[in-house]
Amino acid sequence: MRRSVRNVITTAVLGVALVATTSPPASGQAVPAAGQAAAACAITWGSGDKAAGRLSSAPLVEVRAGRHACYDRVVFEFDGSATGYRVRYAAQVPTEGEGVDLVPYTAGGAHLWVTLLAPAYDENHEATIAGATGDHVVNVLRFDTLRDVVFGGSFEGYTTFAVGVRARLPFQVTVLPGPGTHSRVVLDVAHQW
């Protein structure tokens, strides 16, 4: 008798589970197609060096970060038109002017060496962003890929950052106009390959 009751209960539970996993969704409920989530994050950027633009006198005025569905983003905003950058993965990221390696002080399994072809100071040589060389300038707590953003200084019109990431992952760099007369150099680092 016990065996019969156990078999009936097991059969009933399996039947409910089968119906629950194979029944069509309720009206109006979205069902993603197979592979749709993976396709939505189909990143084709690669992890090779990226460089563009030219030297500008527009000062860097803000550094911020954001989380997105498929990537994490660092935004470098300038007061004026700035289009120049060099970004690459590196074993060492030297500070501007002194050459002190930032990697030992930057969290992450891999490090992007970001050089902006614009100063982080104005025409009077006053700093235009908060933070000194070696400071962690953006809070990236709970980000999927970003681990750290460290200011590497600004010297003779060049500004450096060490961006620590979870691992060597694809990235892209985009130059965007605005807001207003400002411009932005945007670094996106994918969550996965």
Residue ranges and their predicted role:
Residues 1-30:
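Secretory targeting and sorting signals
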Residues 29-193:
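Short linear recognition/processing motifs and adjacent strand/loop elements at protein termini
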